[in-house]
């Protein structure tokens, strides 16, 4: 299984604005998880400065971002999708052992 990271840069006022959007964002995230395309996701930092969402498919990651109210309402200021070459761990896409 391939891995792709959806990387979000969050607006400085993210915490103040996310409340009104969080339910719709989480509904979208859990729908993607239930569909099997989203593995994990969450904010990074305390306070949050970015977010990472791990997907099994790059097209699904892009589609998620394009629909995400955090993106459409501007509390995500930049996003991109990058392949993640996972090599260690039980769910590594390409396990490499010494």
Predicted regions and their residues:
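Conserved, structured core segments of small domains
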Residues: 1-98
């Amino acid at each position: 299984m391939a891995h792709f990271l959806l990387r979000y840069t969050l607006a400085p006022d993210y915490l103040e604005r996310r409340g009104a959007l969080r339910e719709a964002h989480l509904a979208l995230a859990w729908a993607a998880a239930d569909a099997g395309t989203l593995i994990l996701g969450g904010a990074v930092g305390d306070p949050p400065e970015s977010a990472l969402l791990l997907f099994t498919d790059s097209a699904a990651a892009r589609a998620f971002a394009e629909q995400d109210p955090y993106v459409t309402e501007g509390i995500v200021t930049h996003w991109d999708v990058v392949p993640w070459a996972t090599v260690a761990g039980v769910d590594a896409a390409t396990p490499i052992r010494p």
